[in-house]
């Protein structure tokens, strides 16, 4: 069915009569879209709806909300009147008046009651002020007579203050104590005398000079060690002397002797000249000497190391 056919009044009436449209569509609020609003009809419908709601509430609570009183006769619920103090504070915060629930405010009411009484004494005080000017001439006569007596009583009290007595006593005592103090001033004079005494004390400073005395004792040991090293160098094969700069694994006895000799040769100088004299190598030999220490030399025999490994490390 198209929208044009729905605009005809006859079609709308037939649909409403059949009950095809829902109930809300047949109300005056929906019909107002197609014509003027009938306010009287709307008010009648509103009253009818409110009456239905009131009837439902009365049946549910057995209470007449329009008259604000319970329904007479036995019912599902029974209402009893109780004192307001016995009701919990939650229910005393609001009160139902007709169909509106108002919030109770006990504090503002108490404040209003407390403020109102002071207004009456204020009015009385104003009346007293009005009467006061009439009594003023008689009041000042006894007032001056009563005020002067306390003045002489308070005046003598500060007079016997012990301040002036304590001042002269404390002053001479302080002067007498401080006067003899500056007398021992010449005491600092003998101070420079003891300063000259400790001056010669630093004389024994040159004593540490003889410390290098052990040098002559170490000379025979160094010479003996040099001879032992030269003997070991002479017994090594010629191939090891040619590749003396290549690092390798030293023998057990040789490593021990070289370790002991290195500790003693740290202070010796002649071995440096001997080492520089034997350090002449060619370019290919230097490339072969770049092999790391853990790896054996490709040209050296397995198990045979160089004796000059320790001196070369010491020079570097």
UniProtKB/Swiss-Prot annotation:
The modification Phosphoserine is found at residue 268. It holds the Pfam family CDI. Residues 223-233 have a biased composition (Polar residues). It is found in: Nucleus. GO terms for cellular component: cytoplasm; nucleus. Residues 124-153, 181-260, 278-316 are annotated as: Disordered. Residues 156-213 are annotated as: 9 X 4 AA repeats of P-A-P-A. It comes from the Eukaryota. GO terms for biological process: adrenal gland development; camera-type eye development; digestive system development; embryonic placenta morphogenesis; genomic imprinting; kidney development; multicellular organism growth; myeloid cell differentiation. InterPro entries: CDI_dom, CDI_dom_sf. Its main location: nucleus. Residues 251-260 have a biased composition (Low complexity). Keywords: Cell cycle, Disease variant, Methylation, Nucleus, Phosphoprotein, Protein kinase inhibitor, Repeat, Tumor suppressor. Belongs to the CDI family. PANTHER family: CYCLIN-DEPENDENT KINASE INHIBITOR 1, CYCLIN-DEPENDENT KINASE INHIBITOR 1C. Potent tight-binding inhibitor of several G1 cyclin/CDK complexes (cyclin E-CDK2, cyclin D2-CDK4, and cyclin A-CDK2) and, to lesser extent, of the mitotic cyclin B-CDC2. Negative regulator of cell proliferation. May play a role in maintenance of the non-proliferative state throughout life. This is Cyclin-dependent kinase inhibitor 1C. It comes from Homo sapiens (Human). The gene is CDKN1C.
């Amino acid at each position: 069915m198209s929208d044009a056919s729905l605009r005809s009044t006859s079609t709308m009436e037939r649909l409403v009569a059949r009950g095809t449209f829902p109930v809300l569509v047949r109300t005056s609020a929906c019909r107002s879209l197609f014509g003027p609003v009938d306010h009287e009809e709307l008010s009648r419908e509103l009253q009818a709806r409110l009456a239905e709601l009131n009837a439902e509430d009365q049946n549910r609570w057995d209470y007449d909300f329009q008259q604000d009183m319970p329904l007479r006769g036995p019912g599902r619920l029974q209402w009893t009147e109780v004192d307001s103090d016995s009701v919990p504070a939650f229910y005393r915060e609001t009160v139902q008046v007709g169909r509106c629930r108002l919030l109770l405010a006990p504090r503002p009411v108490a404040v209003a009651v407390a403020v109102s009484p002071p207004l009456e004494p204020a009015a009385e005080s104003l009346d007293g002020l009005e009467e006061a000017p009439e009594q003023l001439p008689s009041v000042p006569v006894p007032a001056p007579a009563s005020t002067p007596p306390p003045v002489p009583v308070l005046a003598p009290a500060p007079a016997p203050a012990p301040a002036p007595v304590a001042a002269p006593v404390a002053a001479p005592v302080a002067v007498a104590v401080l006067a003899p103090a500056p007398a021992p001033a010449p005491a600092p004079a003998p101070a420079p005398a003891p300063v000259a005494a400790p001056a010669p004390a630093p004389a024994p400073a040159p004593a540490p000079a003889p410390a290098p005395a052990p040098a002559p004792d170490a000379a025979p040991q160094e010479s003996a060690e040099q001879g032992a090293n030269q003997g070991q160098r002479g017994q090594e094969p010629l191939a090891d002397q040619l590749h003396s700069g290549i690092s390798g694994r030293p023998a057990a006895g040789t490593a021990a002797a070289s370790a002991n000799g290195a500790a003693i040769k740290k202070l010796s100088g002649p071995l440096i000249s001997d080492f520089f004299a034997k350090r002449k190598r060619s370019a290919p030999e230097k490339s072969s000497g770049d092999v790391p220490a853990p790896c054996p030399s490709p040209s050296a025999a397995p198990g045979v190391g160089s004796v000059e490994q320790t001196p070369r490390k010491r020079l570097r």
